[in-house]
Amino acid sequence: MNRLKEKYNKEIAPALMTKFNYDSVMQVPKIEKIVINMGVGDAVQNAKAIDSAVEELTFIAGQKPVVTRAKKSIAGFRLREGMPIGAKVTLRGERMYDFLDKLISVSLPRVRDFRGVSKKSFDGRGNYTLGIKEQLIFPEIDYDKVTKVRGMDIVIVTTANTDEEARELLTQVGMPFQK
């Protein structure tokens, strides 16, 4: 069993239960899934860009991402409907906990001038979104093989009903929020 999942079951869930006075164990918020999305805007001109993004996301997440395609044509962006414009991967279960553990303990401390993640990135429904400016913070990415520095969005979806519950859950997991 993953270190983070073990910690959740033994320490975090009982602590949340006492703090929020839940009647049942099933009411305790837990992390449902993590979605990593990488938008590749230059894939419109350069078809090879999407391949490198897919490869990098595979290394980061440990599973093959889905190529996202344009829903509508937008003439201003020279975009046609159905063109590949990004890649996303949804992590659940064991891989999700592995990724979150790696993100908190290894990758985030490698960000330049890191002072913690924003407390304001909750969506009102208990989900947390985190933007990363460069993929180089992940140890799986080889610096020499990177053609272009790309950012990504990481969405942590929880079963929490409010932002306060989700914030407490992520704080207990070890997410380094700004003071």
From Swiss-Prot:
Organism annotation: Bacillus subtilis (strain 168)
Gene name of the record: rplE
UniProt name for this protein: Large ribosomal subunit protein uL5
Matching PANTHER family: 60S RIBOSOMAL PROTEIN L11-RELATED
HAMAP family given in the database record: Ribosomal_uL5_B
Cellular-component GO terms for this entry: cytosolic large ribosomal subunit
InterPro entries hit by this protein: Ribosomal_uL5, Ribosomal_uL5_bac-type, Ribosomal_uL5_C, Ribosomal_uL5_CS, Ribosomal_uL5_dom_sf, Ribosomal_uL5_N
Pfam families: Ribosomal_L5, Ribosomal_L5_C
Alphabetical list of PROSITE patterns matching this protein: RIBOSOMAL_L5 (PS00358)
